[in-house]
Amino acid sequence: MKKVDVKESAVGRETRIRKQWNEQSIFEQSIQNREGAQSFVFYEGPPTANGLPHVGHALGRTIKDVVARYKTMAGYKVLRKAGWDTHGLPVELGVEKQLGISGKHEIEEYGIEPFIKKCKESVFTYEKQWREFTESIGYWVDMDDPYVTLENPYIESVWHILGTIHEKGLLYKGHRVSPYCPSCQTSLSSHEVAQGYKTVKDLSATVKFKVKDSENEYFLGWTTTPWTLPANVALAVHPNMEYVKAKQEGYVYIVAKERVQDVLKEDYEVLSVHKGEELVNTSYTAPFPMKEVTNGYHVIAADFVTADSGTGLVHIAPAYGEDDYRVVQSEGLSFLHVVDEKGEYTEAVPFLKGKFVKDSDVDIVRYLAKEGLLYHKEKYEHSYPHCWRCDSPLLYYAGESWLIRTTAIKDTFLQNNDTVTWYPDHMKHGRFGKFLENMVDWNISRNRYWGTPLNVWECESCDHQFAPKSIADLRKHSTKETPEDLELHKPYVDEVQVSCEKCGGAMNRTPEVIDVWFDSGSMPFAQYHYPFENKELFEDQFPADVIAEGIDQTRGWFYSLLAVSALYTGKVPYKRVLSLGHVLDEEGQKMSKSKGNALDPVDLVNQFGADALRWALLVDSAPWNAKRFSERTVLEAKSKFVDTLVNVYSFYVLYANLDEYNPDETYDVKRTKLDEWVLSRLHSTTKKVRTALDDYQFTNAAREIATLVDEVSNWYVRRSRNRFWESGMNAEKAAAYETLHEVLVTISKLIAPFTPFVAEDIHLNLTGSSVHLEDYPVVNESLLQPKLEAEMDAVLQVVELGRSNRNQHSLKVKQPLAELVLLEHNENDMDWESYRDIVMDELNVKAFHVELDETKYTSYQLKLNFKTAGPKFGKNVNAVNDWLKQLSQDEVQNFVTTERAVYEAASGEEVVVTTEDVLVEKVAKSGFSNTTNGQYTVMLDTNVTEELLQEGVAREFIRAVQEYRKQLNLPVNLRVDVILDTEEELQQTLTNHKQLLEENLLVKQFTFGHLTNEDDELSLGETKVRIKLSATK
């Protein structure tokens, strides 16, 4: 075995291991070795390579890697195909910025073809950084053969899906109000909108709509979007709701009866009450009357009107509201558009022409006030949708779009979702399920440039549509020869003209590109160019056993995968979804570069190592919980877990090499109870870890392993050190080596999916083979000893209580104490005699015994809890307090047992006192200190005799010399002669404990003499000791 370089940095170790993996093709071997095995399928959600990875990506990649590595070691074949999401507006915006242009008009002036070429060049801007990040974090995924959404084979598969959907009659062209980004100048789908809501304060207005042919009668309508008022064509009431005409300051206002108090506040008189249906067809004068409105400006009935807020009357602007549009269509009212594609007013609103509508609310309100049409204005806080790509506020805007009739197969969506296991479970019928329940048809088209072209050709003469499902299909119907290398992007596909099979007319492609979420949702099929190629491979890799991405993908990729698959095949594309929580800063705030609180995962890997980062992300909390995260979290993972394990591994290698121990040779071994215990813990942990991983409970699995590693380091190795230090090779020492070797090899397999680098380093050095080509550990039931584990757990509890006791009373462990008394509060069959020596040695006490009668060593004190007792006992409180103080110890003990006592007041009143009213304090017998955990109480005799004090000094000296040896980098097995120069009192103490010193310090000879200032000095409290070590001959 190679010596472990404890000074090697984590990054140095990981770089060395990565090089080994690459040279020996370990990743490739791990897949090849499972050829013919059952497949376990996971899909890689495609990131965009025109942005840098963040710490959320580190969590996602870690989780996916843990799953893939574990399932591979569990015997499955796990293909891991990387992917790149390369289309869409973020790419376009980046290119616009690079070119110094802005907006669709300037793009078209620049030229669509050169613009498309620039987009294609830019999509892999950060591919190198993504590859380096992916490799550095240890995520094994095939980045040499990824699926790429811009490539022709991928797009052709997407076309086949869309063509099939069109064939089923589910793709249609419609005019409707859709969420619209005026900055990007394109509409969005409902699941895109769901990703960008923000809480904002907008100016709201209660507007006066004058009833026609009346002197002073007004409908009051409330709106949070005053900018839509110029497009008003109607007012809506609920036909069955009651409305009042109320007089206030000489005016008559019409509002919902339920809202009159909230709207008019005070000083009003209700004149009459009317059903909403009575108000229908009442005409009014619009605040911005438009001559284009030939049928409108009257009250209509609508079921969506409520009295939850506002006035109970809704102002209807059909161009800018989904409900408004539907009701106007059904009523046959006029349609009014006063805003252009940039979100600016047209000449229809002369005084605001060219102004962005969301910046115009104040202008509109001022105009209303000036015209005497403003009843009230106020700031209103509400959730408003913003563009998930550019952060601009969205408008609801009427226009022509291509839509997929998802609502027609809503039941399929819901049934498919019912078969999926969600982590966390509440997502299934909560956030995701509710989104499916409220789904609308998918707005699939985008009026942009860089994306998969919508494969629909329309006839100029008869409106017939043709949706080719392949390049061959398009070529077959083309009116002229199509280039062999036709690129499936604008403007190239736009040049392909098709002949109408119905009338022979010319057909041109509709100019839109598709929603990028449809691209990524098609990946189960398109990654293998299905159905054109790889049919068997696709069938083997569909559906996914699991997918894992951030919670923000709930209405993104998780939805688009489900939707595309349901529309195309009717089948569910995944069996399980791991919805990962956000990684927040240590204050619980979302990380962002603008706030300066974002952590760079590459920096974290370079500083602490990938194993530490991965472990920190896994062990802190379940991955679907939002987690507070910081450099400190990663540092703790490194020091508490990775470094602890490396230290144990280093200890084993060091002593095994010194003793020339060879695990492949046969030795006479005699396993101790400690060996049996650690092997039982190893296999019970293996059992728990496998169970947890099979249920995707990564944090539970990691914590089980962390507990085991801590026990191996701080209990097994520490309690076994004397065996490793002994000369020669006896049966118990051989057992210690054999046991620790088995423990380390098995732990390296257990942690391989979690911390792949340190696992590989340990396994490779101890066995000569890669851990990632091994099977995951299985439980050896014959080694499980639950009773032994329970007993050792009790011992550990007592030792921990003893240490805590010493800490609380400033008694160093090196200072021997006379006695430890253990009080057991619950009867059990624990054989403490078998563990007497361990407890005495660990806690450095000279005697140990178990006592069932705790009254011999403790008593109780009762103090009144005035905070709760004061209000309860009133005038009796002081008398109760005095009574408590004079209770006998038997009476106090009875109160502690029964948890109640009765005080008879001077008035004869009986006052019941319970544990809620009293603070119970356990007091140790004089000369003892106590610490308890409810199950056990540890009593330590704190009287330190002169003899004990002297031994404590000797043990402190041993500790100081051991530290000094480490500073000199002396071999651990080197015996030395020691010369000391110190005061006479310390000389005498050390002489009296010469045997103890020689046993613990590998010292052959101790002598005292005069040393010069050039020799080194040790500090024992305030005492200085000069020391000189020399190797024995």
UniProtKB/Swiss-Prot annotation:
Query: What CDD domains does this protein's entry cite?
Result: Anticodon_Ia_Ile_ABEc (cd07961), IleRS_core (cd00818)
Required co-factors: Zn(2+)
Q: Which GO terms describe its molecular function?
A: aminoacyl-tRNA deacylase activity; ATP binding; isoleucine-tRNA ligase activity; tRNA binding; zinc ion binding
Location in the cell:
Cytoplasm
Reactions mediated catalytically:
tRNA(Ile) + L-isoleucine + ATP = L-isoleucyl-tRNA(Ile) + AMP + diphosphate
The alphabetical list of record keywords is: Aminoacyl-tRNA synthetase, ATP-binding, Cytoplasm, Ligase, Metal-binding, Nucleotide-binding, Protein biosynthesis, Zinc
Sequence motif 'KMSKS' region, residues: 590-594
The EC number(s) this enzyme carries: 6.1.1.5
Q: Motif 'HIGH' region: which residue numbers?
A: 47-57
Q: Where does the signal peptide begin and end?
A: none
Would you tell me the Gene Ontology cellular component terms?
Answer: cytoplasm
Which coarse location class applies to the principal site listed for this UniProt protein? cytoplasm
Q: Which residues bind ATP?
A: 593
Query: What family classification does the UniProt entry report for this protein?
Result: Belongs to the class-I aminoacyl-tRNA synthetase family. IleS type 2 subfamily.
Q: How does it assemble?
A: Monomer.
- What job does this protein perform? Catalyzes the attachment of isoleucine to tRNA(Ile). As IleRS can inadvertently accommodate and process structurally similar amino acids such as valine, to avoid such errors it has two additional distinct tRNA(Ile)-dependent editing activities. One activity is designated as 'pretransfer' editing and involves the hydrolysis of activated Val-AMP. The other activity is designated 'posttransfer' editing and involves deacylation of mischarged Val-tRNA(Ile).
Q: Which PANTHER family match?
A: ISOLEUCINE--TRNA LIGASE, CYTOPLASMIC, SOLEUCYL-TRNA SYNTHETASE
Identification of the protein by name: Isoleucine--tRNA ligase 2
Q: Which gene encodes it?
A: ileS2
